[in-house]
């Protein structure tokens, strides 16, 4: 399996080589902060993404990523990781009216000291995970593929994009967890030029599946696996020795965008999406235990001037996410059939992130620089209905960053990024019936709340050097970056990243 994917990876790289040629302008277009200002909003529409870039650019590289926390900020994600990845990315301008882009990657590595989590994709499936009190290091493998195409005719644009991820996470000592994930996202976008604006709409669909199990081989016996249901609760009837389950889910979304055709004027973005994930117990004829629902709304409105040597942008953003969870009431079994006789919505989670961000930059033929800032309010409220449990925290945060890109000679270019951020807690609260909880569950919840309400400070830096081979359009690059995060609980995180590759 690995060999087949690796051959496909090399074939993709070989095909892309020779179809593009790197220039300083292409490097700036694909890496400058101001050129990618709307990457997380409008570029989710492939019709906009594919026609926002004008110059071909490809990279093939290997990278290593190391992260360590002195005490895990989130127990279920462990104390850090060491990951290695090989990746190829390309953008091709096929003609004045069409473009294609793609990526292929393989990642492998290790996640350290994961506890209270025996499932993959914790951020996505939390709180409906399989968990135990022992945990340990896990091994990770991931294959990723992405491809898109956009075309314009007259005033109309059309784009399509597919993103696929296959991931395998496992542990080779007891408790031997295993999670196998497949995740496919398809995007379709259209846009039309009318008046002074480009008006765009996009659709997105996602299909997700994970098979998840835990085994024990040691002679000392097993420990219970808990079917977690939120804020330190479990589905006790099916906890213990029921250790094989799977998740099925996915969803859909729609996004709308408006952008000025001359790169100066007001712009806006709105997105609505809905997803749901069922947890089913394979040990008991795939009876569904829980179902997690996501409802999200994103809105952004701003003004920008990106034409000429000066770049200015300012926008306001609001992200609302509602997560709710249903627990099925399962009747008495008959001939291995477990009837569902009802359901209760027991878990509720509300996340708010609202912020104002701005950018000011200056660019010329030999380089560009910009300053960018962000200030906002973040809130996370969780509730379990009965017995009543609550946990909440809110923070005000600010971030200031800068980027400097410069062509030092005909063959050497340099890029420097730096940033500082601070997240300060403004309110927090917890309601937990400790008297009715096991000691291990109490410790887990207290740890979660301890870091949920903490203050955080962050410093980050990244430097990249590009070298173009003499007489060739092929270049080499090296990139080194990292960050340092400290929190008010007297714990810290350090993160290092190294990448080496070629551009063409």
Model-inferred region functions:
Residues 233-373:
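Long, internal scaffold/assembly segments composed of regular secondary structure
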Residues 70-77, 113-119, 170-178, 212-219, ...:
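Outer-membrane beta-barrel translocator domains and adjoining extracellular loop/strand segments
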Residues 64-70, 106-110, 151-155, 164-168, ...:
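Transmembrane beta-strands of outer-membrane beta-barrel pores
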Residues 86-92, 145-151, 186-192, 254-260, ...:
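Residues on the lipid-exposed face of transmembrane beta-strands in outer-membrane beta-barrel proteins
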Residues 25-26, 492-504:
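Outer-membrane beta-barrel "beta-signal"
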Residues 20-112:
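N-terminal, post-signal peptide beta-strand-biased segments of exported outer-membrane/organellar beta-barrel
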Residues 54-60, 96-102, 154-160, 195-201, ...:
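Outer-envelope beta-barrel architecture signal
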